[in-house]
Curated annotation (Swiss-Prot):
The modification N6-acetyllysine is found at K16, K17. Component of the ATP synthase complex composed at least of ATP5F1A/subunit alpha, ATP5F1B/subunit beta, ATP5MC1/subunit c (homooctomer), MT-ATP6/subunit a, MT-ATP8/subunit 8, ATP5ME/subunit e, ATP5MF/subunit f, ATP5MG/subunit g, ATP5MK/subunit k, ATP5MJ/subunit j, ATP5F1C/subunit gamma, ATP5F1D/subunit delta, ATP5F1E/subunit epsilon, ATP5PF/subunit F6, ATP5PB/subunit b, ATP5PD/subunit d, ATP5PO/subunit OSCP. This is ATP synthase F(0) complex subunit k, mitochondrial. One of its GO terms (cellular component) is mitochondrion. It comes from Mus musculus (Mouse). The keyword Acetylation applies. InterPro entries: ATPMK. It is found in: Mitochondrion membrane. Subunit k, of the mitochondrial membrane ATP synthase complex (F(1)F(0) ATP synthase or Complex V) that produces ATP from ADP in the presence of a proton gradient across the membrane which is generated by electron transport complexes of the respiratory chain. ATP synthase complex consist of a soluble F(1) head domain - the catalytic core - and a membrane F(1) domain - the membrane proton channel. These two domains are linked by a central stalk rotating inside the F(1) region and a stationary peripheral stalk. The chain crosses the membrane at residues 23-45. The keyword Lipid metabolism does not apply. It holds the Pfam family ATP_synth_reg. Keywords: Acetylation, Membrane, Mitochondrion, Transmembrane, Transmembrane helix.
């Protein structure tokens, strides 16, 4: 049955220590990184300057 895993059970090093699918903290970090990346993309496209046409049609 799925339960809270202890972090001592898994011996990860490097970036795997923070981003993995075995521990609750690792899964949380993956989700937060994904949501943060999506938020940055939305902000980039929302805040970038609008292109103005070279010649305005009258």
């Amino acid at each position: 049955m799925a339960g809270a895993e202890s972090d001592g059970q898994f011996q990860f090093t490097g970036i795997k220590k923070y981003f993995n699918s075995y521990t609750l903290t690792g899964r949380m970090n993956c989700v937060l990184a994904t949501y943060g990346g999506i938020a940055l993309l939305v902000l980039y496209f929302k805040l970038r300057p609008k292109k103005t046409p070279a010649v305005k049609a009258t």
